[in-house]
């Protein structure tokens, strides 16, 4: 339509000028962002809405030098206000794929605006929020049959994908106008939003390049916590007299504490701590059980999981 343009050539890209405007920005990518290594999928559409028209940069030129130059100008020009919906995903992805400065980020995130105003809302996705506040239609309905089982937006016919991407920025822009006015009249929510934007900018700078991880130090920490766990496990088995006592077994823990004359309704941390407070005589066993659990959590949740992510 007259307010919807597909940008298919480098010349058309170079002709775009958004100086002095507020624009909404969104991307679509190939692959499955939930399972694929981060930013390995190509950007197959970039959409910009400037308050009067949507410009959808097609897959042929979305990752071109001209596209990179336009994105750099959008994000660096202080006379252009860039709005996203969950820019913590889009902006680092653009930065990584197009080779931009990691300190570039959007000016406003309408999703964080919504979260700051309505943090107890059950849904913060663009489409349901647009339907609630703007009476928007189900504009993604047609694409769902192509994306079953994962992302893979490359499966969507291009013209349909571009329409979907254009609708995303149109509604992001309209919601931005609505929430911006609401925040102007709500100082408390505005302060929360401004703080969240600071956190978002920090995360965006980190994501394209990651953070350094000292694998030698991680190995040292793992050895330390393994030793702590083994020492606590030895105490558990000494106190209970059971060489195969398993502190992760609720049944065994209940029976062991009962053998000391104390009944507990569950083996949750809070219950065990309360039982220990009420019955100091079980402290050696409870302390050891909790120490085993704590060391296991550090090893499994933090050390091992962090090491697994190195290089992704």
Residue ranges and their predicted role:
Residues 1-59, 121, 133, 146-312:
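Conserved "right-hand" nucleotidyltransferase catalytic core of DNA-directed polymerases
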Residues 12-13, 63-65, 113-115, 253:
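A short acidic, often aromatic-flanked loop/helix-cap motif at beta-alpha or helix-coil junctions
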Residues 13-15, 45, 67-76, 91:
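Short amphipathic alpha-helical segments and helix-helix/interface helices
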Residues 18-20, 42, 75-79, 102:
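Short, well-ordered loop/turn elements at secondary-structure boundaries
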Residues 24, 79-87:
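Acidic beta-strand-to-loop metal/phosphate-binding motif
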Residues 44, 49-51, 87-155, 177-178:
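Metal-dependent phosphoesterase core characteristic of DEDDh/y 3'-5' exonuclease domains
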Residues 50-82:
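Nucleic-acid-processing active sites and adjacent nucleic-acid-binding tracks
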